[in-house]
Amino acid sequence: MSVSLVVIRLELAGHSPVPTDFGFSAAAGEMSDEEIKKKTLASAVACLEGKSAGEKAAIIHQHLGRREMTDVIIETMKARADEVRDTVEEKKPSAAPVSAQRSREQSESVNTAPESPSKQLPDQISFFSGNPSVEIVHGIMHLYKTNKMTSLKEDVRRSAMLCVLTVPATMTSHDLMKFVAPFNDVIEQMKIIRDSTPNQYMVLIKFSAQADADSFYMACNGRQFNSIEDDVCQLVYVERAEVLKSEDGASLPVMDLTELPKCTVCLERMDESVNGILTTLCNHSFHSQCLQRWDDTTCPVCRYCQTPEPVEENKCFECGVQENLWICLICGHIGCGRYVSRHAYKHFEETQHTYAMQLTNHRVWDYAGDNYVHRLVASKTDGKIVQYECEGDTCQEEKIDALQLEYSYLLTSQLESQRIYWENKIVRIEKDTAEEINNMKTKFKETIEKCDSLELRLSDLLKEKQSVERKCTQLNTRVAKLSTELQEEQELNKCLRANQLVLQNQLKEEEKLLKETCAQKDLQITEIQEQLRDVMFYLETQQQISHLPAETRQEIQEGQINIAMASAPNPPSSGAGGKLQSRKGRSKRGK
């Protein structure tokens, strides 16, 4: 036998206090609180990520629908042993101070006189108003069931916490304690939760171990609370109990969980095992059996007048059309059908609210099972779909029911074959996906190795780049310096060339002047040499004459020089005389 575990989520308003010791998880030993919270809010975080504050508020309001937050009263009752242990632990630290104070007071009473009674009164007296075990919070209680069934075998982990879904309000806390009295020794704590649902409350019972919870489940599940009333104890295993704020996305859908509506007549949760769900136009849901016992046309809860025709005020919340409307049985959202704009189906995709009812004929559609569930119920023994027992007496209605049942059987068989086909296809896809994942992992490892090698190479190249940049900077500095020096040298060369031209012109002029000066000097030297020769000749002649006798000198002084004609050659005898005369003439010129 298998059961579905439930998840209880308390969605609180922003200003509401958080109840103490409400959180629980059957997988607490396997996962930490942070991991559990992260897994719980994964879909909500993914849905709200990257949205603005206005968009987040709109999404949260869309999933809340017409549900309103009310006061939820939580009464906690702990085991007696725990209370005794807590009391002892509270008294232990104060035992020594009390004894010391008493001894100090006794010693003071011996040494001093007793004081007046007014002085012995304490300055401050502590007191507590109200019941400390009762907490009042403001929010909405959500009940989810897991899509995966859990076996009731002993070796399968389930939970150490059970939930009594519907306890009648006629049962007081004292009556409830009597009901669970045989298991008082193994119960750690009980939490009685009262919300806006009238005439009932819910109880969370935490046991010491899962074996104790299994014993209580086997003994009390389906058992009447007392022999007078017909109400029975409906127990479910609690996989997780959590408290979340509304702004964190507590009303958003949770992966692998389905939120269950409840019948407002019998106050029982409406699971797929209890089909025939009907929701009136005033947004109250009932079991088909509960509503059939109501002969009036008004709503059993609010006395709203029901009519078979669609109300004109009803319209799609998205596009505003008033035909082919479907109402969500979880939050009351009204959307158009798949033949208009598919807003009802889009609401299911966004919120995972499974059941929707057509407003015109009250037919209920299950989006998860993809079939109608308003005329079919599931047998509790074998789980097969059986015909809903209609109380109508007309033959026409029986024929219609038979046709509907036949169509449902045909649809079920076809869906079963489709399920097998798609499951096989999913297996093949999973196999191919696993191979692709392995290939991608291999490629990923290779890519990681390449990235590591490229990173090493990149680091080396960066170092080389830095060294080259430093060298380039140095070379640029040197080039700039050399360019400056080259400019200076070019300017200097230009100046030198200009000076060279000036000097060359001056040199030419100096050479020309030197030549003229040299020519003049040569002429002067020639004249001076001739004069010097004449002087030397004169001096030599004078010396020679000075050595001659006096008569000769006188003869020379008185002698005359005659210049003969050049045509007749001179006789040899006159040669000496000619020479003598020329010398005399020179000597005279010299004198």
From Swiss-Prot:
GO BP terms in the entry: MAPK cascade; negative regulation of signal transduction; protein ubiquitination; Ras protein signal transduction
Zinc fingers typed UBP-type, residue spans: 300-392
Phosphoserine: residues carrying this PTM: 52, 116, 118
Any Pfam family: zf-UBP
Compartment(s) of residence: Cytoplasm
Biased composition regions of type Basic residues, renumbered to the chain: 581-591
Positions of the UniProt region annotated as Disordered: 82-124, 563-591
Record flagged with keyword Transferase: yes
Residues the record lists as binding Zn(2+) 2: 328, 331, 347, 353
Catalytic activity: S-ubiquitinyl-[E2 ubiquitin-conjugating enzyme]-L-cysteine + [acceptor protein]-L-lysine = [E2 ubiquitin-conjugating enzyme]-L-cysteine + N(6)-ubiquitinyl-[acceptor protein]-L-lysine
Principal location: cytoplasm
Domain of life: Eukaryota
UniProt biased composition (Basic and acidic residues): 82-93
Zinc finger RING-type: from-to: 263-303
InterPro entries in UniProt: BRAP2/ETP1_RRM, BRAP2_RRM, Nucleotide-bd_a/b_plait_sf, RBD_domain_sf, RING-H2_BRAP2, Znf_RING, Znf_RING/FYVE/PHD, Znf_UBP
GO terms, molecular function: identical protein binding; nuclear localization sequence binding; nucleic acid binding; ubiquitin protein ligase activity; zinc ion binding
One Gene Ontology cellular component: ubiquitin ligase complex
EC number: 2.3.2.27
Biased composition annotated in UniProt, kind: Polar residues: 108-124
Expression by tissue: Isoform 2 is highly expressed in testis, lower levels in brain, heart, lung, stomach, colon, uterus, liver and kidney. Isoform 1 is only expressed in the testis. Isoform 2 is predominant over isoform 1 in both fetal and adult testis.
Keywords: Coiled coil, Cytoplasm, Metal-binding, Phosphoprotein, Transferase, Ubl conjugation pathway, Zinc, Zinc-finger
Subunit structure of this chain's protein: Interacts with the nuclear localization signal of BRCA1 and with the N-terminal of KSR1. The C-terminal portion of BRCA1 interacts with DDB1.
Name of the protein in question: BRCA1-associated protein
